[in-house]
Each structure stands twice: as C-alpha cells, then as structure tokens.
Amino acid sequence: MSNVIIFTGTHFTPALAVIEEIKKKEPWEIYYLGRKYTLEGEKIPSPESQILPKMGVKFIPIPAGRLQRRFTRWTIPSLLRVPFGFFKALKVILEIKPKVIVSFGGYVGVPVVIAGFLRRVPILIHEQTATVGLANKISVRFAQKIAISFPESKTFFPEGKVVFTGNPLRPEIFKS
C-alpha cells in the first residue's frame, strides 16, 4: 500500500507550498479535504478545488460548517453542516487510510482532524499567524505536533508539541 497523506484547512497558500515540496521529493499519494466554495452563500469555486486536481492531488470537498463568533443569517445553516463535515471526513479517512493528516487551520480542518484522531491517524497542525485561530484552538487537542510560523505562538500550545518551522513559501515568491 502506498503512503497516503491528507492535507486540510483553509489557509491554502502555505499548504500548497508544502504539497509542492512533497511532490518533488516523496512518493506520497496526496489528498486535500477542503472547501468547495470560497464563501458561504456564494458559488465561487475555492482556489484549492481548482488548482490541486490539475497538480494530480485528489481534492475532496468537505461540507463543514463554519464556527462563527457572531450571529448572522448563515449561523444556523452553518452549524447544521458541522456533523455532515465530520461524517464525510470520517468516511474518507476510513476509505483511504492516511498515514498522516496535516491541517492548515480554518473551519474545514476541524472535522477532518477530529475524525483522524478517532481513527488514530497522526495529526500535524500548522499555525501561520502569531495568534491562534478558533479552528486551531480546537484542533490542537487532537494533534501530536504543532508547527508554528512565529516563535511567540508557542505560548498558545502545550509544551513538547511545538516545532518552529516558519511559514512555508512557494519558490515563485522569490522570482521577479
């Protein structure tokens, strides 16, 4: 059986940098469990749903609900989608049997991380910002390692789980 890795989350650019590097160096079968559309209520395809299939990465949309801090017209429909996202993620994890899950934060990553934890799949979370978002605050309980971009972020996470990696960058950023 091949090595299977799942990427997830809504911080797509750093995830893409890691995916591109893995594709160059390792023979992993890569899946991305992400959002189908950019915003709730709009039918604009997400960048990950458009870019990754062209790279040979298997994109699977997860109908996860956003955990909102304010009540809006999307709050109730979004909360109702939370269990659907979890069960879809669990189904995918049971089918493809990943060796590891890498989450780049955001609401879509939470059900994938929890489902992976329940199936005893090792979880790595990457936090791109100096302060921790709600999704990573939830997901950190289920992760074995947390990669951080800023040293000051380590105060938000349990000791022994944190690895300072910086923010993954794509080589194109250095080209003029």
What are these regions (language model features)?
Residues 1-11, 15:
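Nucleotide-activated donor-dependent transferases that construct or modify glycoconjugates
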Residues 2, 29, 117-176:
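Active-site-proximal region of nucleotide-activated glycan assembly enzymes
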Residues 6-8, 33-35, 103, 126, ...:
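Short hydrophobic segments within beta-strands
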Residues 7, 21, 28-81:
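Conserved nucleotide-sugar phosphate-binding/catalytic loop shared by glycosyltransferases and other
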Residues 12-16, 40-42, 47, 101-119:
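An aromatic- and histidine-rich active-site surface loop
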Residues 14-24:
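Histidine-anchored nucleotide/phosphate-binding helix
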Residues 24, 87-101, 109-124, 137-142:
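Glycosyltransferases and closely related glycan-assembly transferases
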